[in-house]
Amino acid sequence: MLVGAARSEILPPNTVSTYGLTETCGGVVYDGVALSDVEVRLSNGRIHVRTPSMARSYRHGPLPLIDGWLDTGDLGTFVESPHDGSLAQGMLRVDGRSDDLIITGGNKVWPHIVEQRLREHPLVADVVVRGVPDTEWGAIVKAWIAPTSMDRPPTLDALRAHVKETLAAYCAPQRMTLVESIPRSALGKVLVSELPE
């Protein structure tokens, strides 16, 4: 089941998260736990994996492996196991792509967390959040909003106030662009290159 950015409260209770990459030839982590023969470690928050099922190379060159470890480009955290506590390092929580993280004025902002909050606003049908360069802050938070009605879209001030109710002020979008719809691939992935400036 592809759930993309679905809200957790609308997912069936038996939904589990899995994690894998093309390079690992499929899933390597099931519900936060590495499969047998799979090693997972974090280095500066970045997820590294080593598995016997690792691809040998890319079509046009070698995999960037160091001692068999692949830097996935994803950021993660080991969190306490809600099960019996027997997992020494905890369960893997994937926080997002390292290149998606917005650093604004030295503060870290995960776009998917801001998107989740903005989707809760009654005038927002869909949203995507990204960092855009800024000379003063390094980057600022920008939201592309597909409103429920283009005749009655939310204001930037209203959305900022909505975000600040539950998240830090620096997470609130500094800029907003209204769009009819968020451009997505057939699998629901946002087509960032098709977003208007």
Predicted regions and their residues:
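Phosphopantetheine-dependent thiolation modules in NRPS/PKS and related acyl-activating systems
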Residues: K189-E197
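AMP-binding/adenylate-forming catalytic domain of the ANL superfamily
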Residues: L167-V190
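Residue-level recognition of short loop/turn positions
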Residues: N44, Q89, S185-L187
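AMP-binding/adenylate-forming catalytic core of the ANL superfamily
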Residues: T51, G73-C171, E194
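Gly/Ser/Thr-rich phosphate-binding loop
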Residues: M1-G32, E39-R41
